[in-house]
């Protein structure tokens, strides 16, 4: 147990942020402090954990209390937000315009001119601020051969059971992805929506326990350049506090929704202790069709993106490593990443986005020191040796079955509604309307009882629902 020197809790009248010195010419960054005592959370690590990792079937669904209404821009009149607002040096916040969203979803103004005086990413993809006192954004893995793993919009909360498709979606809500990463000794930078942390804090604790890096993705997921200065402060503050309350750590990293950022937003975030993290490759996975979330991008298009990056790396065409935008948004996005990660690992070294940029202390709590990336292209998997007893039965699916989209694996089935798409490894598009694209597949099912006997490092391939298809 520890008490971070950078997190001092005192009354609301006290200074809301404590300045730290810098030697690189950047505006002094500050470590957040909070106006009332935050209880130390239980069931969470207080320093980096390199394994073995916790694999769980269920998580506590108790929500945090004392936070703003979820998915709404928080009030700017609360005493906590005002205290943070008053701590910022507004002379160092550029006067970029507060933009509006038009009926077609575009921004107004959509550009600040060809000289781009405010480094407006949504217009020019600018990643180096036009003011010298702010650092450049992190947007790539500098070293060739690295894949910076990131997921936005988590933690993926379970869907209410009275919703259509809830049972199918909830198979892939957390802890599904975090279990998968933990089993395979993989780590990601997770950009959390504060509202999702507030409603599912146990998922954030599991992610931290399993060696992932937690970052901020705002409270309500609104484009940041469309918000007032005070609204930006409120969005970031409550997200930081939610993560701190749930896990005990205070992030130094954040990502703006849609990448929408300019130097006005960057300066406010930097003065609140956060550095901007973007990307140089985008899967567009959020736009895949899902019964609950809409979307129109064929999953095969997303497959092509992954394969294109792999081919480019194999051909020596990539000048740097890549930092890739993915989401833990629904069963489609979670299945997509589970399908591709084993393939990606054959070509790239997969690490968190912050790790590939040499950041070993991503929180203001200095007891958390993450490993230095060693520059090699090897991967390590920890697995468990078990004794198993099996009973095998063979069943044949009926003709013209239905299926549910969202899983992978040539000719396999995960027990939803039958076995179809047996000629493909990806049946998302064909199954999206619940119909198979061809004759059914005969399926052999195996019931397995397992007793753990010993644990060692080995290389195994476990076929479970993470890798099966609705095929």
Regions found by a protein language model. Name each.
Residues 1-20, 464-471:
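Fungal secretory targeting signals
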Residues 19-28, 403:
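Cleaved targeting-peptide boundary
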Residues 20-22, 42, 335, 400:
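N-linked glycosylation sites
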Residues 22, 36, 378-401, 442-461:
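Extracellular mucin-like PTS domains
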Residues 60, 64-223, 231, 235-252:
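Active-site beta->alpha N-cap acidic-glycine motif
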Residues 118, 122-125, 401-441, 465-471:
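Secreted, short cysteine-rich peptides and small extracellular cysteine-rich domains stabilized by multiple disulfide
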Residues 198-202, 219-364:
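Catalytic domains of cell-wall/extracellular-matrix polysaccharide-remodeling enzymes
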Residues 320, 346-393:
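Low-complexity, Gly/Ser/Thr/Pro-rich intrinsically disordered linker/tail segments
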């Amino acid at each position: 147990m520890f008490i971070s020197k950078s997190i001092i809790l005192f009354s609301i009248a006290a200074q809301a942020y404590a300045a730290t010195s810098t030697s690189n010419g950047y505006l002094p960054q500050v470590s957040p402090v909070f106006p009332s005592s935050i209880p130390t959370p239980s069931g969470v690590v207080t320093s980096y954990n390199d394994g073995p990792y916790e694999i769980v079937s269920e998580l506590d669904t108790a929500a945090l209390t004392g936070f703003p209404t979820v998915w709404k821009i928080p009030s700017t009149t609360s005493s906590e937000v005002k205290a943070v607002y008053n701590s910022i040096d507004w002379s160092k916040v550029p006067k970029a315009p507060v933009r509006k969203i038009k009926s077609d979803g575009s921004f107004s103004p959509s550009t600040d001119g060809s000289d781009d005086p405010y480094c407006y990413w949504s217009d020019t993809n600018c990643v180096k601020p036009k003011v010298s006192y702010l650092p450049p954004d992190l947007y790539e893995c500098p070293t060739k051969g690295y894949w910076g793993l990131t997921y936005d919009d988590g933690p993926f909360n379970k869907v209410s059971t009275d919703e259509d498709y809830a049972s199918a979606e909830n198979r892939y809500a957390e802890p599904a992805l975090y279990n998968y990463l933990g089993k395979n000794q993989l780590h990601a930078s997770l950009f959390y929506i504060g509202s999702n942390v507030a409603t599912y804090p146990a998922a954030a604790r599991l992610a931290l326990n399993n060696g992932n890096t937690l970052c901020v993705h705002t409270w309500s997921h609104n484009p940041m350049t469309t918000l007032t200065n005070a609204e930006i402060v409120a969005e970031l503050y409550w997200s930081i506090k939610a993560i701190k309350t749930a896990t005990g750590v205070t992030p130094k990293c954040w990502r703006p929704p849609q990448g929408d950022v300019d130097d006005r937003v960057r300066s406010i975030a930097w003065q609140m202790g956060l550095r901007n993290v973007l990307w140089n490759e985008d899967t567009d996975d959020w736009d895949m069709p899902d019964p609950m979330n809409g979307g129109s991008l064929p999953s095969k298009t997303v497959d092509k993106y992954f394969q294109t990056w792999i081919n480019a790396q194999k051909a020596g065409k990539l000048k740097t490593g890549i930092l890739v935008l993915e989401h833990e948004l629904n069963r489609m996005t979670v299945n997509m990443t589970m399908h591709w990660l084993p393939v990606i690992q054959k070509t790239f070294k997969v690490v968190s986005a912050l790790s590939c940029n040499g950041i070993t202390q991503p929180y203001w709590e200095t007891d958390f020191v993450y490993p230095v990336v060693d520059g090699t292209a090897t991967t390590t998997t920890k697995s468990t040796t078990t004794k198993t007893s099996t009973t095998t039965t063979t069943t044949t699916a009926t003709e013209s079955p239905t299926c549910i989209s969202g899983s992978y694996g040539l000719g396999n089935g995960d027990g939803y509604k039958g076995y179809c798409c047996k000629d493909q490894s990806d049946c998302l598009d064909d199954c999206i309307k619940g119909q198979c694209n061809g004759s059914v597949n005969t399926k052999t099912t195996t019931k397995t009882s397992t007793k753990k006997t010993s644990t060692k490092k080995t290389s195994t391939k476990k076929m479970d629902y993470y890798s099966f298809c609705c095929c």
